[in-house]
Amino acid sequence: MAQSKRVKAIAVAVAPGKAYAFEDAIKILKTATKAKFVESIDVAVRLGVDAKKSDQQVRGSTVLPAGTGKSVRVAVFAPAGAKADEALAAGAEAVGMDDLAEKMQAGDLSYDVVIATPDAMRVVGKLGTLLGPRGLMPNPKVGTVSANPGEAVKNAKSGQVRYRTDKAGIIHCTIGKASFDDEALKSNLQALLLDLVKAKPATSKGTYLQKVSVSSTMGPGVTVDQSSLSLK
């Protein structure tokens, strides 16, 4: 089905301004999903924040209970010893210090997540211009600077997603694949929303979770009725 036909199919199925129960919203998306690859299911959450204010920017990470459906390659900066061994045991593809930094500077950047122990940041700091633009720079706010690298690796590989408000105060995140069953997608979305609520800035006023929309990789969004979700 051509993308234009897919968009039209969803547009016909969706009533303007209507919010759908989660299961109905997902059904609409899956019915119109005809791509030759397994599409992702994405969510856009409009928050009641002023993203222009530094104290109202929302950033963090969530471990999705049903995972993301993606294979994640992890590199860890940790000094030789217990912490490095812990990271390797958890499944990290690469662990090191200056040697790992040199490999990255030489072009080895085939990683989805880069983690560092606090005492390794002196090495990682030199890679800011390399890792920063790729979204790979370790940051304590999203759990990628950690004194427990083994746990951080396990989280990354078991379905951890990072989120950050854009200029419009919207969070964009993937909550799984179209091949996931509805309950898995729902549990992932609920986990994300609960963590967003926990991360609510103290200065945010009014309705915080203003709008939740789900979409497939190639399709438009369908608004979700939040009362169909368990957010307590």
From Swiss-Prot:
Pfam families: Ribosomal_L1 (PF00687). One of its GO terms (biological process) is regulation of translation. This is Large ribosomal subunit protein uL1. Belongs to the universal ribosomal protein uL1 family. Part of the 50S ribosomal subunit. HAMAP family: Ribosomal_uL1_B (MF_01318_B). It comes from the Bacteria. GO terms for cellular component: cytosolic large ribosomal subunit. InterPro entries: Ribosom_uL1_bac-type (IPR005878), Ribosomal_uL1 (IPR002143), Ribosomal_uL1-like (IPR023674), Ribosomal_uL1/biogenesis (IPR028364), Ribosomal_uL1_3-a/b-sand (IPR016095), Ribosomal_uL1_CS (IPR023673). GO terms for molecular function: rRNA binding; structural constituent of ribosome; tRNA binding.
